[in-house]
Swiss-Prot record:
This is Translation initiation factor IF-1. It is found in: Cytoplasm. The keyword Cytoplasm applies. GO terms for molecular function: ribosome binding; rRNA binding; translation initiation factor activity. One of its GO terms (cellular component) is cytosol. The keyword rRNA-binding applies. InterPro entries: NA-bd_OB-fold, RNA-binding_domain_S1_IF1, TIF_IF1. Its main location: cytoplasm. Belongs to the IF-1 family. Residues 71-94 are annotated as: Disordered. It comes from Rhodopseudomonas palustris (strain HaA2). The gene is infA. Pfam families: eIF-1a. One of the essential components for the initiation of protein synthesis. Stabilizes the binding of IF-2 and IF-3 on the 30S subunit to which N-formylmethionyl-tRNA(fMet) subsequently binds. Helps modulate mRNA selection, yielding the 30S pre-initiation complex (PIC). Upon addition of the 50S ribosomal subunit IF-1, IF-2 and IF-3 are released leaving the mature 70S translation initiation complex. Residues 1-72 form the S1-like domain.
């Protein structure tokens, strides 16, 4: 199948399923099961419930899709996990 035949949708991850699969609520209102694309696995991009994602689907099977992109959070300060514990000191060579 040529890449021109694939359809892209945006949606919201509602549930994480076993085997790197996700239940995704599309913006159009449909709910599908999507799996993580190989490049996302290779680059260790983690997807959590509540993330906005882009899904690639075949026009022949509109119940399954491939998760190809996780959108960055629009929340302020969402640039990483918060650190816990005391602040670190400066690095000193011996």
């Amino acid at each position: 199948m040529a890449k021109e035949e694939l359809i892209q949708f945006e949606g919201l991850v509602t549930e994480i399923l076993p085997d790197a699969r996700y239940r995704v609520q599309l913006d159009a209102g449909h709910e599908i099961v999507a799996y993580t694309a190989g490049k996302m696995k290779k680059n260790r991009i983690k997807t959590l419930a509540g993330d906005r994602v882009t899904i690639e689907m075949s026009p022949y099977d509109l119940e399954k899709g491939r998760l190809i992109f996780r959108h960055k959070d629009e929340r302020p300060g969402g640039t990483g996990a918060p650190r816990s514990g005391p602040p670190r000191g400066q690095f000193r060579r011996r």
